[in-house]
Amino acid sequence: MTEPSSPLVIEELPSDLRRPILVAAFAGWNDAAESATSAARFLCQRWSARRIAQILPEEFFHFGLTRPEVRIQEGTQTRKIRWPANEFFLSQETSLPRHAIVLAGIEPHLKWQTFCGHILEVARRAQVSTVITLGALLADVPHTRPVRITGVSTDRQLAERLRTTPTRYEGPTGIVGVLNDACRRGGLDVVSLWANVPHYVSEVSNPHAILALVRRVLDYLEWNTDLGELEAGATEFDRQLARILAQKPEVARYIEELERRGAKAEAAEGESPGDLPGSAQLIREVEQFLREHRRESGQN
């Protein structure tokens, strides 16, 4: 379906899709605690999604920075190279009111506008009219509060429907920001959902952030499913942090200060309230504790 020389490889694309949406998430700068890509993977799994297209990496990646990986195929001694992947998956869940295409990828190093052009080509061929991009950022927020979802949208009603807090951020952007702009210029409705992740637990998976993003997408689709797996992960995450607070009163005081700051008022967009005394050391202790606990329990 695509030219042999094109990095966009469309393997199959049914012509009878029901008002499809595109959900996109990228590992890297846009993906604090891997929250966005974990949400995308969860949706793919829950919808039994199958791959329908991919963007080959050769033109867009510096392999000295993001290296391919060697994997041994199960049950054999055959080694296989796994390249950085940007893949499109089509939902096969028949109870969904409309089809969903999920792009699970990695932020490329090169030719971002060309890269986004290939994404829009898939959207055009599939007759997608709405794009939801997922991201996650580190913020001065406590884990004891509901996850705040910030974002931007080309459609005010769409933003209100997804309950996003508007952002007036200005500054460096990632592939998500570039894709949002490309969609806008291409005439597609786009909303970008960003989970605010507590910066003191940035190096471990955050089930609360994953759950918040998944719920927003499912709410948009008006589709219910059992989220017990994610909810159980969030409960265990809280339990682990409660152990830290019980053992380390200085960490508890740090989080209480974050709670007080949040209770007074949200910090002005783009401003940081600044580091609390000794915060860097506390962050290292929290993350070390969580990593050790997950190794002991066999969690990823």
Tell me what each language-model feature is.
Residues 31-38, 110, 114, 170, ...:
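Conserved active-site and cofactor/substrate-binding residues in soluble primary-metabolism enzymes
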Residues 201-300:
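A conserved C-terminal secondary-structure "cap"
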